[in-house]
UniProtKB/Swiss-Prot annotation:
Name of this protein: NACHT, LRR and PYD domains-containing protein 11
Species name: Homo sapiens (Human)
Superkingdom of this protein's organism: Eukaryota
Keywords: ATP-binding, Leucine-rich repeat, Nucleotide-binding, Repeat
Its biological purpose: Involved in inflammation.
The family this protein is said to belong to: Belongs to the NLRP family.
Example GO BP: regulation of inflammatory response
GO molecular function, one term: RNA binding
SMART domains cross-referenced by the UniProt entry: LRR_RI, PYRIN
Encoding gene (name): NLRP11
Amino acid sequence: MAESDSTDFDLLWYLENLSDKEFQSFKKYLARKILDFKLPQFPLIQMTKEELANVLPISYEGQYIWNMLFSIFSMMRKEDLCRKIIGRRNRNQEACKAVMRRKFMLQWESHTFGKFHYKFFRDVSSDVFYILQLAYDSTSYYSANNLNVFLMGERASGKTIVINLAVLRWIKGEMWQNMISYVVHLTAHEINQMTNSSLAELIAKDWPDGQAPIADILSDPKKLLFILEDLDNIRFELNVNESALCSNSTQKVPIPVLLVSLLKRKMAPGCWFLISSRPTRGNNVKTFLKEVDCCTTLQLSNGKREIYFNSFFKDRQRASAALQLVHEDEILVGLCRVAILCWITCTVLKRQMDKGRDFQLCCQTPTDLHAHFLADALTSEAGLTANQYHLGLLKRLCLLAAGGLFLSTLNFSGEDLRCVGFTEADVSVLQAANILLPSNTHKDRYKFIHLNVQEFCTAIAFLMAVPNYLIPSGSREYKEKREQYSDFNQVFTFIFGLLNANRRKILETSFGYQLPMVDSFKWYSVGYMKHLDRDPEKLTHHMPLFYCLYENREEEFVKTIVDALMEVTVYLQSDKDMMVSLYCLDYCCHLRTLKLSVQRIFQNKEPLIRPTASQMKSLVYWREICSLFYTMESLRELHIFDNDLNGISERILSKALEHSSCKLRTLKLSYVSTASGFEDLLKALARNRSLTYLSINCTSISLNMFSLLHDILHEPTCQISHLSLMKCDLRASECEEIASLLISGGSLRKLTLSSNPLRSDGMNILCDALLHPNCTLISLVLVFCCLTENCCSALGRVLLFSPTLRQLDLCVNRLKNYGVLHVTFPLLFPTCQLEELHLSGCFFSSDICQYIAIVIATNEKLRSLEIGSNKIEDAGMQLLCGGLRHPNCMLVNIGLEECMLTSACCRSLASVLTTNKTLERLNLLQNHLGNDGVAKLLESLISPDCVLKVVGLPLTGLNTQTQQLLMTVKERKPSLIFLSETWSLKEGREIGVTPASQPGSIIPNSNLDYMFFKFPRMSAAMRTSNTASRQPL
């Protein structure tokens, strides 16, 4: 890195100001300093001043050289030279402020909302500035070594403005005095354009001609602040191996290596970071957010929102009326947490007030607000009514918006604008209307005032007959350097909003144009929802759909859409989510199963004395949600997962579950924590007269909970017949408590204990209880309980003598041949009542199959046998077929998935299909049967002697002849069902829903995009949606 050519950085000039005697002393001091700084040594004694001045810069980094020189000059009392270095450093600090002042010229000052926001954030951000002041003060309790300060906030929430204001305050001497000497500003966009760089080059990028005083900037890293904006938008992962990190500020390295070296302080140790990001907290954010770091969130609180409205309207009465409208709807509250969206809302409401319109009727949803914003901005110029020019402007704007989103482009070049037909005059109109503005992160580019406006225009494009178009910035060569956009849920929401005739009328009346695709999409969506249950790509959860319906709010249309829903999954993370879900669930007249997750709403929010207004609002919504459990006539199953309930919210849930009108038959609780340790909840269930299935999974079961469960099951009126305690970390020490449940003499008929490390010791305790005369258990599920052959003798006794046990599931336990022999041997005796035995994944081989075949041939009670994922092989299958062909075999189901079978056993299997008159279900998935083997089985399936109703066959890779035979089977036996799932996916094998609040997990994609992207209007555009050449609408 070239430094200034003045004497400020001229080493020789400094050395020549030393006498010969002083120079000799200097070299001795320098040798010691090199050792102190732990730098590589070289011979100094014989060097001249010129030689030393030439050698130092190629041997050491500049900051080390000048720090050593300053220290030596101080020890030598060369005050004139020290003053010169101090003066240079002071000038460079001022020069840095000048560089930052130029860079932070506030672009928004040229726009109405920009000036307004500058003043607003300056007035209301004192709390953030206070945190930033303390965080970088090494003497403050708030500070820590190598501190990162994270400024979190949604898109356009004011993060950039607050950062700019903080830097301007530093420039003016109002912040970080004697704490920060230099600021280096980086944005995700700048970083995404780079491939390799040195730290010196990175620092110098904003300085005139790239000439920065690197030595002075890095001389004291503890006074150096790096500002990194939009960490979540960096296009590459920062999971760099420690061994690849670099400490040399002049060495060029890949950008990920450089950033991680900085963030982990391998470079510039002791420096500070101010990082902005959206609260989604992507992988890069989670990688670097440490416990000691400071994290503050930017959003407009109720108090700040009130200040905003009062400042905007300058009329308290109008501001109060506008605020009341916003506060009546959580969607609008959420919208107005973001400053620019708040500005759009206020702008629209003010225009409606100025026109004397009833704004409370015409501005109820974001669709209303965005429609009014676009219509007013594009058609109100000089009082003109809409004409073809305005309509053309709207169409081109929507084409640009849609083309941008489908190609992950949010910042548009001049070429992009020209390609969709915009002239310079058009751009000036859009800029004056505050729709399209110069980008504050991408030089010489434009962007929509907010992503929501681009999404709204994309929704209009969806319902317009606009052509497909590839904007230049969306081409493959820019793929790695542009933003990521993949969540189209807001676009879908706006589309549904525009399906409402009243909301659509705002645009259609203003522009004199009707959106041509409305009716076709409306009826398409109704048909799609009616067939949703038959679609393998059906919705995984319903929140995005519910937001769409809430935005629409046409009662008959909403009813029609949700009428077919019998199962709904909702993730509730805010009051807004609860409000929207309540609205839609109220129309779900045929709902039988509700799966519910409540995250972060009540977590760690136990009121100290009485609930705050905000907490009360959440509790009111929660009470309404819970009331559905006893007011929905059709609701029979409730799954609550990934929930953190405080005391009040748990009591509200408990009251609903004990309500006399509650008709729930099934209650499943997974990853649920409660303030009372489930005491309130379980006491409520004791008073529930309809519940037959209780599942408490993925939860620690305390002794008190066992006691409460015992009391519930002992209640004469208790109807619970199936209790599931999967993945609750139950061990042998808890088996005495489980045993007490078994002998309680109550209603319990089925117990599921899967995925608990009971081990053989625990199983032996349970076996004693299973033989107790009070035990009336019919079904026991012990999948993956760490059982071995050591407990199988005890299990055998249970099977031999239990008068009630009919079903036993021991899948995924290491029983081996010895254990399986002990478990199956009792089935040869008439006292054994077992009807279903599941031994999949129990590590036995074909050697034991002769004994299983005898059981199959002699036990007339056995109806179901699951032995998949064992090493049965063709030899074992031949033996089993002998048992299956025996006239005394009464099996209805046999599971043989993943048993290492080949075509060699298929002739015997085929004969079973035509001779066995009871077998209705056979699963052979994940076996390599080949074309010949599958063909033999298909030929038997055609036979009228075959009574099979359900079959699982490996059908991939079949040749044409076998595929034709398969089609023949399906034609002749249309009722025959072909399975696609194995034993591991059956009911009772699942562990529970992975909690979205756990680190590294997120709410899954809902698959709502399938409905939109399968719509014929979209198919051409989205056919290549996951490729670099994705086409826009």
